[in-house]
Structures are given as structure tokens and as C-alpha cells.
Amino acid sequence: MIEIKKAKPTSPGRRHVVSVKNTELHTGKPFKGLVEVKKSKAGRNNTGRITVRHQGGGHKQHYRIVDFKRNKDDIVARVERIEYDPNRSANIALVLYADGERRYIIAPKGLKKDMSVVSGEKVDVAVGNCMPLRNIPLGTVIHNIEMKPKKGAQMIRSAGTFAQLVGKDNAYAIIRLRSGEMRRVLLDCRAVIGVVSNSEHNLKSLGKAGAKRWRGIRPTVRGVAMNPVDHPHGGGEGRTSGGRHPVTPWGIPTKGYKTRKNKRSNKLIVQKRK
């Protein structure tokens, strides 16, 4: 059961907090055999230089090893529990296969404890089941889609997201993404039936800057508030508008300027996003 709760304004930090609580989530620790240490990088690369701004600090986290390939075919798995994962917006499910192996998978909406899921070439079109796109009926809502066969799911993994299978053309399936983009994917690529869980994720309001810091996100300082040495918009006597069209700290135009690189996979886009 999902509970959306608005906090009472007992302090400025609590005034705007909106929390989403799922009473069906596991409250204990994760399964120890599928957890790895996650080292904090704080946005630095191997030379110690900042390569991603606004990262650092935050609560210590452990990485849950999630099975994106779903390659354990024709072995039924029972859902032991649904868990919170601090590394992603979606919830994850711990499943126990008939041969005794446990794995984490992305939990689709509607998947509950003691339900069964299975992967394979020809399995039932049911929530949580994984199969190649060639065996999925047109119009089906899917997620966790591979871009290359056997590589593992790369698309549609965030909370509440889904795509729709709208056509099949020779060796390709045509899928419609949430952005409105129509894209061709090889029919041998796999996908999971259903919508990704935790669709209420966007209703959450952190309420204060400190809650961002708990998540390892540092402040974003405006360029006009900096010195000229730090940003093209910096400096000036008194408050200024920056004196030029908006640019990034490296002088590249921003706010509407397209920076997407041309890639080989562009030829697979049938219709661009809206």
C-alpha cells in the first residue's frame, strides 16, 4: 500500500516535505550475497580532478547487484520480497529460482511477494516475465529493454517508466519511448513485461537543501555569482546579468543549444523525441 504524507510545518525544513511510503517494502537489510561496497568518488577521476560537478558527501551506500540480463531461462523464480534501492529510483525484487539461486531484478508495478516470474524464448506475457521482442505481442507495455542482444537492459529502467511495442519490421522491432521517440531495436533483444515500479517517485518533495546533501548532491552555484577566473559570467561591479548569452563554465552556449553528438545508433531512430 502506498501512503503519500505531507509533513506538518513544525520547522522551516519540514514545511515542504512530502514523503511517499510503501508499506510492502522490506524493512531489513539487503541480501548479503548480492551487495558490494560502493566507493564514493565525489565527482573525481583517477587523477583527482573534478570531472562531474556537484557531487560529494552523502550517506554511505552499498551497491545491490541487479540482474539486467535475465538469462536464467525457463527456471521459475519466486519473489521473496520487494526492497528499496538507494542507487536507483525504482524498487528491486529479490527472487529465488527453483535451483536455489537468488538474484535482484527491477521490480515492475504490480509485482508482489510470492508471485512468480520467468525468462525464456516462449513464456507467458505476464508482468515481470522476460522474453525476446520477437515473441511479444504488438501494443504490449514493456521496460528493461536491451539495445544489443545479450548485453543486458539499458533502456526504460527508471521508476514509473515504460515503452510500447508498436511494430515489427524485418529484423527490427519498433518501440515508442516515453519521450515520444520511435526507435528500432533488434528483435532478438529482450524486454520485461509491464511498467517499472515506484511511479509515485515524482510526487516526493525533499523539503530542504540538507536532504539533497544526504544524497551526495552538492550546491549548484550561479556563474554570475562567481569571479571572472571561475566562469565567463563572473565578475563586474555590483550585480550584473552576465553580459552575454548564457554559456557553460567552459564557454559553450547553453539553454537550448543542442550538444548531442552524432552516433552510429542514430540511424535506428525512426522519429525524434518531441
From Swiss-Prot:
One of the record's GO cellular component terms: large ribosomal subunit
Keywords, comma-separated and alphabetical: Ribonucleoprotein, Ribosomal protein, RNA-binding, rRNA-binding
Annotated SMART domains: Ribosomal_L2, Ribosomal_L2_C
Gene3D superfamilies the UniProt entry points to: 2.30.30.30, Nucleic acid-binding proteins, Ribosomal protein L2, domain 3
Any GO molecular function: rRNA binding
KW S-adenosyl-L-methionine (keyword) present: no
SUPFAM superfamilies assigned to the protein according to its UniProt record, in alphabetical order: Nucleic acid-binding proteins (SSF50249), Translation proteins SH3-like domain (SSF50104)
A Pfam family the protein falls into: Ribosomal_L2
Gene Ontology biological process terms, A to Z: cytoplasmic translation
Region (Disordered): 224-274
Annotated Basic residues bias: 257-274
Functional description taken from the UniProt entry: One of the primary rRNA binding proteins. Required for association of the 30S and 50S subunits to form the 70S ribosome, for tRNA binding and peptide bond formation. It has been suggested to have peptidyltransferase activity; this is somewhat controversial. Makes several contacts with the 16S rRNA in the 70S ribosome.
Annotated family: Belongs to the universal ribosomal protein uL2 family.
Record text on subunit structure and interactions: Part of the 50S ribosomal subunit. Forms a bridge to the 30S subunit in the 70S ribosome.
Classification via NCBIfam families: rplB_bact
Name of the molecule in the record: Large ribosomal subunit protein uL2
Species this chain originates from: Francisella philomiragia subsp. philomiragia (strain ATCC 25017 / CCUG 19701 / FSC 153 / O#319-036)
Organism lineage: Bacteria, Pseudomonadati, Pseudomonadota, Gammaproteobacteria, Thiotrichales
Name of the encoding gene: rplB
